[in-house]
């Protein structure tokens, strides 16, 4: 229901109330001159009553809108981590080729562009630091134990000799892209994994594996590796927002991380043996596709300033617009509002923290145009009429129309500023 329909319904409700009032008043005061129904009233009086009903509906609509706006702005400033939209997330897998001879380190927050077949571009950021190693899973063997349990031999190969061990090694547990089966396998690793050992070299004869020079490894860590998020890692998400991302796409918890020792000479491959105390889960088949190296979780976010606004006292509410309208960006989370003055960029305080002039409030996702939501910046600056100020909004943006234009496969490339 749009605003016009809401206003018209409120007007009909007011006219119904006026009609009931006129009927009750006519019953109590029969000689007042008012008719028992509005349709029988004098045209001038009828128009006056309709005007009263219309303006009453407008006042009621404006008051309701202002109360809702004030309540939402208050919640937005106190609990922004609960009201911010959840961006799209995903996992990109690096496919190694003969051209990759050395590991490639990708920092956390590295920007990528995903271009679909219809030439739409979407901006993504990596969620954690990762390293692409020139390796791939050649084979996986499931070997039953002597009495109980079993062993899983994962044979890694590379197209060129490795001068250094692929440390740290992050592996994604992905069972035919099924979340439930993948988490079932992750639970099996966490509950039944007893030990992990490493053999540096190509696995030729598995039957002779007991004679190999094995190196014992620490048990793997899972998920985000237990590393706390710090400000210098360019992280702007609240811990609750991170938990909301998990419930939207829990695959980031399907990673296991291994610490490998240094190698003394070049190697052409290596084998990792996982020893379990329980048999392999029923209904799951061990194949080389269940453990995937070189995977990076990423998120559809981009940090950039909004269009600058000029607070000159004529208006107090300004739309927060992206500098790239054609890209379909919507405001995900404001990071700060700054005023340009002689000292440079001065941050403004939020209205819920301080009423010191100037301060600001954010009205998020209140205007919808052509299927997109826009937010407003409200400035409390009484001196702006005599002393105009130029303001900038630093924010995180996302592209919610990604799901409408997602076509697989797509081209992914690093974004060069």
Kindly label every feature range from the protein language model.
Residues 2-17, 336-417:
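C-terminal accessory/interaction regions of large nucleic acid-associated machines
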Residues 2, 99-132, 319-360:
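Activation corresponds to long, low-complexity, non-globular regions
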Residues 1-216:
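Extended assembly-interface regions of large multimeric machines
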Residues 81-83, 143-148, 254-270, 370-402:
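Short, surface-exposed loop and linker segments with low hydrophobicity and enrichment for Pro/Ser/Thr
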Residues 92-94, 105, 110, 281-305, ...:
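Surface-exposed flexible segments
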Residues 159-170, 174-357:
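Short, low-complexity Pro/Thr/Gly
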């Amino acid at each position: 229901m749009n605003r016009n329909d809401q206003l018209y319904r409120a007007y009909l409700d007011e006219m119904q109330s006026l009609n009931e009032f006129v009927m009750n008043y006519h019953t109590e005061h029969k000689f007042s001159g008012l008719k028992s129904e509005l349709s029988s009233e004098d045209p001038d009086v009828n128009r006056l009553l309709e005007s009263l009903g219309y303006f009453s509906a407008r006042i009621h609509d404006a008051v309701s809108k202002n109360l809702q706006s004030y309540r939402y702005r208050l919640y937005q400033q106190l609990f922004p981590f609960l009201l911010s939209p959840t961006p799209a997330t995903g996992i990109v897998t690096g496919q190694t080729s003969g051209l990759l001879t050395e590991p490639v380190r990708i920092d956390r927050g590295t920007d990528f562009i995903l271009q679909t077949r219809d030439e739409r571009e979407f901006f993504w950021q990596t969620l954690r630091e990762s390293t692409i190693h020139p390796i791939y899973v050649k084979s996986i063997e499931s070997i039953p134990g002597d009495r109980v349990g079993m062993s899983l031999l994962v044979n890694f190969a590379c197209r060129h000799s490795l001068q250094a061990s692929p440390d740290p090694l992050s592996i994604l547990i992905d069972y035919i892209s099924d979340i439930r089966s993948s988490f079932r396998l992750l639970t099996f690793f966490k509950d039944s994994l007893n030990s992990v050992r490493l053999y540096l070299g190509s696995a030729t004869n598995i039957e002779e594996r007991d004679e190999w020079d094995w190196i014992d490894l620490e048990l793997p860590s899972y998920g985000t590796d237990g590393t706390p998020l710090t400000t210098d890692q360019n992280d702007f998400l609240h811990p609750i927002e991170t938990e909301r991302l998990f419930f939207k796409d829990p695959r980031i918890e399907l990673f296991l991380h291994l610490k490998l020792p240094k190698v003394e000479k070049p190697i052409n491959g290596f084998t990792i043996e996982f020893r379990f105390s329980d048999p392999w889960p029923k209904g799951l088949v061990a194949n080389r596709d269940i453990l995937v190296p070189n995977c990076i979780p990423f998120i559809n976010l981009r940090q950039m300033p909004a269009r600058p606004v000029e607070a000159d006292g004529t208006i107090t509410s300004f739309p927060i617009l992206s500098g790239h309208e054609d890209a379909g960006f919507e405001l995900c989370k404001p990071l700060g509002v700054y005023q340009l003055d002689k000292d440079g960029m001065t941050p403004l305080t939020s209205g819920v923290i301080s009423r010191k002039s100037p301060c600001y409030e954010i009205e998020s996702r209140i205007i919808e145009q052509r299927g997109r939501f826009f937010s407003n910046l409200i400035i409390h600056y009484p001196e702006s009429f005599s002393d105009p100020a130029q303001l900038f909004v630093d924010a995180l943006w996302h592209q919610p129309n990604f799901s409408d234009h997602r076509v697989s496969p797509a081209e992914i490339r690093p974004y060069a500023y």
